[in-house]
Curated annotation (Swiss-Prot):
Organism: Shewanella halifaxensis (strain HAW-EB4)
A molecular function GO annotation: protein homodimerization activity
Protein name in the entry: Protein GrpE
Keywords recorded for this protein, A-Z: Chaperone, Cytoplasm, Stress response
Family the UniProt entry places it in: Belongs to the GrpE family.
Subunit record text: Homodimer.
GO CC annotations, alphabetized: cytosol
Pfam families (UniProt xref): GrpE (PF01025)
């Protein structure tokens, strides 16, 4: 009986040990599975965070680019505004001076039509001449320049040819007579000089 009792006890011990081993393996397996789940979740979370970080970095780069473009646009607007203001200052007198040019032309015609040597008209000539010189020097202070090209080579940017005549005194394509002087304001042509050009 002791053999049978021993065997029965041994079987019971084996069953208990196997049960415990199964429990331990199950717990171990459950612990490992739980650990694996946590690790998988952590890896998934890391991937999500890396993706969010990458999206945030892309957004930051995009916004940096937008800020740079906006700053460049502001600089361009400032530059254009400064140029516009400068042009406005430079050429604000253009319309006014254009209205004064006929007055100056009339003074020059009066000088051409008056005999400077005759006693009766000498005083008038000198008065008109002084007035014309004073007038020209005043408007020159504001950037007006006369274009008086007598003897110069014809320049279509500054001169308007009224006609061409043969001339032994002037080489070909030279201004031989100025019908009406031209004017520039701050290097911008207001009116071309009306000229007669030699054919040579």
């Amino acid at each position: 009986m002791s053999n049978q009792t021993n065997k029965a006890q041994d079987n019971q011990v084996e069953e208990i040990v196997e049960g415990e081993l199964l429990n331990e393996n199950g717990t171990e397996a459950t612990g490992e599975a739980s650990l694996m789940d946590e690790l998988t979740q952590a890896n998934f979370r890391v991937e999500e965070l890396e993706k969010a970080l990458q999206e945030a970095e892309t957004k930051v780069e995009s916004q940096k680019d937008s800020v740079i473009r906006a700053a460049a646009e502001v600089d361009n607007i400032r530059r254009r505004s400064a140029i516009d203001v400068e042009k406005a200052h430079k050429f604000a007198l253009e319309k006014f001076i254009n209205e004064l040019l006929p007055v100056l032309d009339n003074m020059e015609r009066a000088l051409q039509g008056t005999d400077a040597e005759a006693e009766a008209t000498k005083a008038i000539y000198e008065g008109v001449e002084l007035t014309a010189k004073s007038f020209v020097s005043t408007v020159e202070k504001f950037g007006l320049t006369q274009v008086d090209p007598l003897g110069d080579t014809f320049n279509p940017e500054l001169h308007q040819a009224i006609g061409m005549q043969p001339s032994a005194d002037f080489p070909a394509n030279t201004v031989m007579m100025v019908m009406q002087k031209g004017y520039t304001l701050n290097d911008r042509l207001l009116r071309p000089a009306m000229v007669m050009v030699s054919q040579g």
